[in-house]
């Protein structure tokens, strides 16, 4: 019996929640949004939200505990992505990039070097703001992935 995947979303700063809901509805997949209590809302519209303590890694820990092999994860957190890839999940960035295990070492190294630079007072520009085109690209990539799965 094949297990139906769920979509788990690192929801605190996820800009593509609406697109995720649209694709999940199309493919009849359950979506679980995981966020800290700092993002609590009573207006969850019947969606599956899990709110966790505001501690630094609370949402990550909950997502690690919930994720099963074959699940689809959406997160910008490279560290969380690397752990969940090792569990056999499929991890997407908010921009629709499908992370791959063989790329994680390099991505973690870059993240580490950037953190060291910030400690030294060197700051680089962050990512550009999400555009409608970026949202559409995310939706297209997630849809294509699910069609080919």
From Swiss-Prot:
Pfam families from the UniProt entry: DUF188 (PF02639)
Name of this protein: UPF0178 protein Lmo1456
Family affiliation: Belongs to the UPF0178 family.
Disulfide topology: none
InterPro entries cross-referenced by the UniProt entry: UPF0178
């Amino acid at each position: 019996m094949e297990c139906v995947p769920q979509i788990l979303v690192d929801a605190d700063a996820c800009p593509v929640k609406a697109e995720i809901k649209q694709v999940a509805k199309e493919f009849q997949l359950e979506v679980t949004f995981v966020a800290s209590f700092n993002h609590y809302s009573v207006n969850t519209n019947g969606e599956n939200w899990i709110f966790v303590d505001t501690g630094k890694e609370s949402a990550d820990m909950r997502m690690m505990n919930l994720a099963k092999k074959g699940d689809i994860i959406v997160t910008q957190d490279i560290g969380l992505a690397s752990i969940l890839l090792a569990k056999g999940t499929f991890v997407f960035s908010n921009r629709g990039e499908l992370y791959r295990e063989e790329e994680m070492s390099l991505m973690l190294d870059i993240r580490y070097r950037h953190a060291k630079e910030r400690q030294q007072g060197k700051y680089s520009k962050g990512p550009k703001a999400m555009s409608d085109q970026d949202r559409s690209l995310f939706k297209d990539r997630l849809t294509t992935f699910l069609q080919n799965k």
